[in-house]
Regions:
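Structured beta-strand-rich core segments of catalytic domains in phosphoester-bond hydrolases
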Residues: 37, 45-113
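Conserved beta strand-loop-helix elements of the APE1-like EEP
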Residues: 64-80, 197, 209-229
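Active-site beta-strand/loop signature of hydrolases that rely on acidic residues for catalysis
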Residues: 7, 23-41, 105, 133-155, ...
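Active-site beta-strand termini and strand-to-loop segments that position acidic
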Residues: 74, 98-101, 224-225, 250-253
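Metal-dependent phosphoesterases centered on the DNase I-like endonuclease/exonuclease/phosphatase
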Residues: 51-55, 127-214, 218
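Surface-exposed cleft-lining segments at the edges of enzyme active sites
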Residues: 85-86, 110-126, 162-166
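N-terminal, active-site-proximal structural segment of metallo-dependent hydrolase catalytic domains
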Residues: 1-49, 55-57, 61-67, 153
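Active-site-proximal beta-strand elements of phosphoester/diester hydrolases
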Residues: 1-9, 102-112, 146
């Protein structure tokens, strides 16, 4: 199974830049989208179906034009779960999950910490999401949690770790949380295969950051350790330019 995660920063804007044609060419089995910024009726369902994705699940935020996640699949899932059931996590449309025979795939959009209030919300979300996943794994051990975590894990994952040491997305508390999350039974699939620097998934729109590859790796496909032996490949697709993020990919037997 080939799974892509992609923060599209507005699905309608991405579509205007050729997203559907790119999707048809890339041809993943499942694609997890974040920051769709649209409701289901604002998305061209039939065009996406014609591209090969009849199974489409959208979970928008209550606030219009904000946040929201989706999963598009070639394969019919056995079950679909929208949100976590925890109100403060769900009103912003931050995760949707599909269950297949051998594994489950979740699209996650973890909050950013753009100011003190949002940082506090992010920390609360992180803690509650960890608890939610700990319980979920008892029921569903084979989990693939794809998405925009809004956290660079290590210095290798950010272009200027010293200057960004006190910036949300690279704070010690955030990085420690990701450490704990991984130690609770997940694998960073990209780093499982690739230990090289200068591999990023997000670039600021400012000052030619993308052209100069001054980026952050904040998008991940985290895979349950139970699936370790089935990991085949994981990589990043920086040439896809429908967003300020780029797609990240994992392939599982």
């Amino acid at each position: 199974m080939r799974i892509i995660s992609y923060n599209v920063n507005g699905i309608r804007a991405a579509i205007s830049k050729g997203f559907i044609e790119w999707l048809q060419h890339s041809n993943p089995d499942v694609i997890c989208l974040q920051e769709i910024k649209a409701t289901e009726d604002q998305v061209p369902f039939l065009d996406i179906e014609m591209a090969g994705y009849p199974y489409q699940y959208y979970y928008p935020a209550t606030k219009k034009g904000y946040s929201g996640v989706a999963i598009l699949s070639k394969i019919k899932p056995n079950n679909i779960v929208f949100g976590t059931g925890i109100e403060h996590m769900d009103f912003e449309g931050r995760n949707v999950r599909v269950d297949f025979d051998d594994l489950s795939v979740m699209s996650l959009y973890l909050p950013s910490g753009t100011n003190i209030d949002r940082l506090s919300h992010k920390f609360m979300f992180m803690d509650d999401f960890q608890n939610y996943v700990n319980e979920l794994k008892k029921e569903i051990p084979n989990l693939v949690i794809c998405g925009d975590y809004n956290i660079c894990h290590k210095a290798i994952d950010i272009h200027d770790p010293i200057r960004n040491a006190n910036v949300s997305g690279f704070l010690p508390q955030e990085r420690d949380w990701l450490d704990r999350f991984l130690k609770n039974g997940f694998i960073d699939s990209f780093r499982f295969f690739n230990d090289q620097p200068d591999n990023y998934s997000w670039w600021s729109y400012r000052a030619g950051a993308r052209g100069n590859n001054k980026g952050w790796r904040i998008d991940y496909c985290l895979v349950s350790e139970t699936l370790k032996e089935k990991l085949k490949r994981a990589y990043i697709l920086p040439e896809a330019k429908h967003s300020d993020h780029c797609p990240v990919v994992v392939e599982i037997e």
